[in-house]
Design a protein with these regions (language model features):
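Short helices/loops that flank or line small-molecule/ion binding pockets
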Residues: 99-106, 127, 229-237
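Bacterial Sec-exported substrate-binding components of ABC uptake systems
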Residues: 2-6, 18-58, 153, 157-188, ...
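Alpha-helical, coiled-coil/dimerization segments enriched in small aliphatic residues
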Residues: 78-81, 164, 198-226
Length: 305
């Protein structure tokens, strides 16, 4: 009888041991966020980030838009809007990141745009911090995708998707009301002027997209670079000139710009640099401002090369 009991317990222990070795394994936890970023790199965030550094003015604005500003622990020196960004720790410029400050913030992820070098991306990742690049591929159109992606990363997906849909509707509405190409006024945006040379936005830039969405023609639409000659400027002889508000008085009083018909006719308008110089949610303000100027400007000339 004792031998039987011993064999029974031995059999039971072996069976339990065998069962334990083949117990079902716990399924691996699904990653919070997976995506191929704008640098075509596979991105995986295991957990929802709670501490985020943004080195892109556009991304920073979008985080405020979707209601995720409380997760921002650091921004670049160029992130100046909305005004609340003044209270957020600065981590340097887009070309001179202060890695020591950035590391001290213990971010879960760093969000970047198109102006960060691959060298800086590598340096951040070597510190063990994930980097996600979200480039607004075509400026205004690309802003909608940025809203969606930032919404997902910050757990504000519903708000991000809603704002993206609204943004696309705004673009479609303005395109629908734009005049025919032959009726568009030629607009010259002064990026730079004076002794250092003349500069304007060439084709395939977000500034050209802003001007065209406003129903106008970009004076630099045939250029591939930002610098232009005086001969080119006077040949184009733009209907309307836009210049940063703080530079408008100097521009209209400086020779030889005083000889341009737009200057003579009082068709030089100051514009907020934050609306047009960088890709931003405020680009739509520039679109509407330029569209209104084109509607109310007295000139009917449309100069073509």
């Amino acid at each position: 009888m004792k031998a039987f009991r011993f064999l029974f317990f031995l059999f039971l222990m072996v069976a339990l041991s065998f069962t334990g070795c083949h117990s079902p394994k716990t399924a691996p936890k699904e990653a919070f966020f997976t995506w191929e970023d704008s640098y075509h790199r596979p991105i995986t965030l295991a957990e929802a980030p709670q501490r985020i550094v943004s080195i892109s003015p556009a991304i920073t604005e979008v985080m405020f838009l979707v209601g995720a500003q409380d997760k921002l622990v650091g921004v670049s020196d160029f992130c100046k809007y909305p005004p609340e960004t003044e209270k957020i720790t600065k981590v340097g410029g887009m070309h001179n990141i202060n890695f020591e400050v950035l590391l001290s913030l213990h971010p879960d992820v760093v969000l970047i745009g198109s102006m960060i070098s691959q060298q800086d991306v590598d340096a951040i990742e070597k510190m063990g911090i994930p980097v996600v690049c979200i480039v607004e591929e075509s400026s205004l159109e690309g802003m909608a995708e940025m809203m969606e992606v930032v919404g997902k990363i910050t757990q504000c997906e519903g708000k991000g998707d809603a704002e993206a849909a609204l943004w696309r509707d705004k673009i479609a509405e303005r395109k629908a009301h734009a005049p025919a190409p032959e009726n568009r006024k030629c607009v010259y945006y002064v990026v730079g002027f004076g002794d250092g040379g003349d500069f304007t936005a060439p084709k395939n830039t977000h500034i050209q997209e802003i001007i065209e969405l406003a129903g106008a023609r970009n004076a630099g639409d045939s250029l591939t670079g930002w610098n232009i000659s005086r001969e080119y400027l006077f040949k184009v002889d733009p209907d309307i000139i836009l210049v940063r508000r703080e530079d408008s008085a100097a521009f209209v009083s400086r020779h030889p710009y005083t000889q341009l018909n737009a200057v003579k006719g009082g068709r030089v308008y100051g514009i907020e640099s934050g609306w047009i110089d960088v890709v931003s949610l405020r680009n739509m303000n520039a679109v509407d401002y330029i569209a209104e100027i084109c509607k109310t400007s007295r000139t009917t000339k449309t100069t073509k090369e």
